Amino acid sequence: MEPLINGPGFVEALTDWVEATKYVPPGGINFGLGDEINSFGGGQTLFSFSWDDAFVAAMQDDSPIKNKVGAAPLPGSDRVWNRSSGAWENEYNQAPYIVWGWTAAVAKASKNQDVAFDYLCFFANDANHQADIAIGRFGVNPFKKSDFVPELYVERQGWDPEIAKQYADTLMEMEEGSTNRVFPLRVPGVFQFNSAIATATSKALAGQLSPQEALDEAAADWKKIVKRIGADTIREAYAVGVALEDNL
């Protein structure tokens, strides 16, 4: 099991990311999700590519740019690296935003299962859910079919009809029209893998390492993680995740 994270495609992506840092607001390289939501939602930044939390924050009544923003699918690339042939291909590629709802569970050992389930049902009822998706910092995104009806946002939140339609259509088109996606990694060691790539990319963004050097470092760390956990263990867990995706 060899990491591919330091291949040409990923290096090119990190190179683009480093280049993009020239255009971030002051301190933007170190933004967390909350900072990004507040910056775009408050009208301090022009463009946000993330979950739709920042867009929703921009459309709240307390935002200076309410009804002055737009939604569009995430941009793609006009070429891709084919790792099988070892060559670049001039083919457009675009990966979508994945519409997904939060999930919750009650522990089997809980002494108050009925109360816990009752609370979850209350918390997730339609009225509360629709209130939650209207507040950017809550991180509750549309995922029910009823969430993609533009009139919901026009009538309840005072959104401009054209912007509401653009928002709902953008999310629904990516959800229904794209199969070019992979869900987040769900294997033993996932947090270690993520931490290694976060550390490496941070060094590239700070100018301490080139994109290639940074991802070479990440690949070396990933090899250590695989050796520590076991390739077969990771492979088996990954297969379970893929099977789940194939049945959605």
Task: Give a label for each model feature.
Residues 28-42:
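Short helix-initiation/N-cap motifs at beta->coil->alpha
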Residues 14, 215-226:
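Short amphipathic alpha-helical coiled-coil/interface segments
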Residues 203-217:
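Short, charged, surface-exposed loops that flank catalytic or proteolytic processing sites
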Residues 4-11, 31-34, 110-114, 187-195, ...:
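Soluble non-cytosolic domains of exported or imported proteins
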Residues 54-65, 77-199, 234-248:
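C-terminal lobe and pocket-closing loops
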Residues 46-51, 70-72:
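Paired acidic/hydrophobic, glycine-rich loop segments that form the ligand-binding mouth/hinge
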Residues 18-25, 44, 52, 59-62, ...:
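Sec/Tat-exported extracytoplasmic proteins
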Residues 1-30, 73-79:
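Glycine-centered hinge/linker elements that transmit conformational signals in sensory
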